[in-house]
Regions:
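Alpha/beta enzyme core
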Residues: 1-52, 59-82, 96
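Internal helix-turn-beta structural module
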Residues: 71, 87-102
Length: 102
């Protein structure tokens, strides 16, 4: 997503945007959401929710994203891996780890 894309989302009345690299496998050479975030937050922060998706593996990554202007983070793959490896207990453990790190 570019700054212009984010501005357009605000113009058409979107309530949120998601910065994602689609698991880093869809577009060869795509920019990291963390790299895009500061410029996009400067351009549209406060006008639209900014959800960072991609590269979030630890609680410290959540703190970094929030400090750069995100209003939320997505952590889907982490929960799926935890569920597959450890079932409900695995998900509970990863939630505890994330909370402890934050």
């Amino acid at each position: 997503m570019s700054v212009e894309d984010a501005k357009r989302a605000v113009e058409i009345g979107a309530s949120a945007i998601m910065l994602s690299n689609h698991g880093g496998r869809q577009l060869d050479g795509s920019r990291s959401p963390f790299d895009q975030l500061p410029a996009i937050a400067d351009a549209v922060g406060g006008k639209i929710e900014i959800i960072l998706d991609g590269g979030v593996r630890r609680g410290t990554h959540v703190l970094k994203a929030l400090s750069l202007g995100a209003t939320a983070c997505s952590f889907g793959k982490g929960f799926l891996f935890a569920l597959g490896a450890g079932g409900q207990k695995g998900v509970e453990q990863i939630l505890k780890r994330m909370k402890d790190e934050i």
